[in-house]
Amino acid sequence: FIAQEAPANPEYNYIAIDIKNEMLVLAKRKLEAAYAEQQLPLDNVRVMIDNIMYLRECFAETDRLDRIYINFCNPWPRGKHKKRRLTHPRQLVQYRMLLDGEIWFKTDDDELFEESLEYFPEAGFRITTMTRDLHSEPTLRYFETEHEHMFDEMGKKIKFLIAEPDPSVPEESLRELLQYSEKYSERKR
């Protein structure tokens, strides 16, 4: 995904984050090949190994993100593990503190998607675009990921949404969720 998105938009900067080093090594190789093929300098994307739970620690308070892509993340289906989801309200509020734009979320997992439809409003987002069959929506511009291609060939429908911060959500409720999120993060470190 990043090897398609970043060279197509050289005016934007990208950060690819994953907790697995193997994924980032593969992404880096694909980035280098894509930029070499297009004879572009690889100067608008960085790869970083880290736990996304600590994303806010990677940026200054004044740094802002225009868009966050969450593509085919671990669905953590077991009840006690759901709080590890990248779309759990505790995590979404972390993103919200850095975000001036949108979150684009894609998955093949029905349960994760349906529960995420509830998570986003809980974390102070409003869903502006949503489909349970992305490939039947020709008006949506996106780059297909390898997982997406694989799942599509298996006949699985790709679910997709775009969410943005909801300005009508009181800051106090976001602060409470953020405090809970930070308290949990400190215990896990």
Give the label of every model feature segment.
Residues 1-11:
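Conserved SAM-binding loop of SAM-dependent methyltransferases across substrates and taxa
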Residues 90-93, 114-135:
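Conserved Class I S-adenosyl-L-methionine
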Residues 23, 112:
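Conserved short alpha-helix immediately C-terminal to the canonical SAM/SAH-binding motif I
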Residues 128-189:
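SAM/dcSAM-binding transferase cores
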Residues 28-67:
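S-adenosyl-L-methionine
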